[in-house]
């Protein structure tokens, strides 16, 4: 599960670069939404991983 948390976090960072950096202005809205979705998924995966190991 920790692996998925890292993957989701990396995807969130990539979405943030596109959304907040102005690189792709036409996709900025979608990238901002994806950033928050993947941050939530990363946190959820991290918490589930901690619960399973605990």
From Swiss-Prot:
InterPro entries: DUF1328 (IPR009760). The keyword Membrane applies. One of its GO terms (cellular component) is plasma membrane. Disulfide bonds: none annotated. It holds the Pfam family DUF1328. The keyword Transmembrane applies. It is a multi-pass membrane protein. It comes from the Bacteria. Its main location: membrane. Keywords: Cell membrane, Membrane, Transmembrane, Transmembrane helix. The chain crosses the membrane at residues 5-25, 30-50. It is found in: Cell membrane. Belongs to the UPF0391 family. This is UPF0391 membrane protein Mpe_A2904. It comes from Methylibium petroleiphilum (strain ATCC BAA-1232 / LMG 22953 / PM1).
């Amino acid at each position: 599960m920790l692996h998925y948390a890292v993957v989701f976090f990396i995807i969130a960072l990539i979405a943030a670069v596109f959304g907040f950096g102005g690189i792709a202005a036409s996709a900025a809205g979608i990238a901002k939404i994806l950033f928050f979705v993947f941050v939530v998924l990363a946190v959820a995966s991290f918490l589930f991983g901690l619960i399973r190991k605990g």
